[in-house]
């Protein structure tokens, strides 16, 4: 068992989080393994987690086996490069005299855009609407739909915060645009 230092990191605005206190998210790092990162979403429907390993491409996911189930699936994935078949670019060189390749342009303009500056985390407010079919799939309730949205945002924010320096947060009244009724369906 690996202990983690965990802190609350809600995907909901403070007002929306106060309306739905049983739906939240957490982030954490390994106490004895600081290279391990954790993202966890919690709701009455259950928990979902992602643990990033020693390399950013090593991931363990813990998910409910199915909607309404108390069984969980643990999936560990590791991306392994195939050294037997190394990558070889088959794109032909430009045939136009004086044309520059993308590699030439990038080399000339070193680091035009930094993908993520670890010291800056930009927060974007997100208003996310879903159809009644989406809500039906997750139990037909507002809480079930918001719990599913929270699970998705937990995974997205894990990637976006690491790679882009961006965090998405649901707006205050996002519950008003989650459609749980088949009629009238605005879609």
Whereabouts are the PLM-identified features?
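N-terminal prosegments of processed precursors
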Residues: 1-67
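Fold-level signature of zinc-dependent metallopeptidase catalytic domains
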Residues: 71-187
């Amino acid at each position: 068992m690996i202990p983690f230092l965990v802190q609350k990191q809600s995907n909901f605005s403070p007002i929306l989080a106060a309306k739905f206190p049983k739906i939240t998210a957490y982030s954490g790092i390994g106490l004895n393994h600081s290279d391990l990162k954790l993202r966890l979403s919690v709701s009455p429907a259950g928990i979902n987690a992602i643990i990033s390993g020693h390399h950013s491409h090593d991931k363990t996911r813990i998910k409910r086996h199915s909607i309404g189930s108390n069984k969980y699936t643990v999936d560990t994935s590791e991306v392994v490069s195939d050294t037997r078949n190394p990558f070889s670019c088959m794109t032909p060189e430009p045939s136009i005299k004086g044309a520059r390749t993308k590699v030439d342009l990038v080399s000339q303009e070193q680091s035009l855009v930094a993908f993520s500056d670890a010291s800056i985390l930009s927060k974007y407010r997100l208003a996310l609407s879903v159809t009644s079919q989406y809500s039906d799939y997750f139990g037909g309730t507002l809480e079930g739909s918001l719990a599913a949205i929270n699970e998705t945002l937990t995974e997205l924010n894990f990637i976006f915060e690491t790679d882009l320096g961006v965090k998405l947060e649901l707006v205050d009244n996002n519950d008003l645009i989650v459609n749980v009724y088949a009629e009238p369906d605005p879609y």
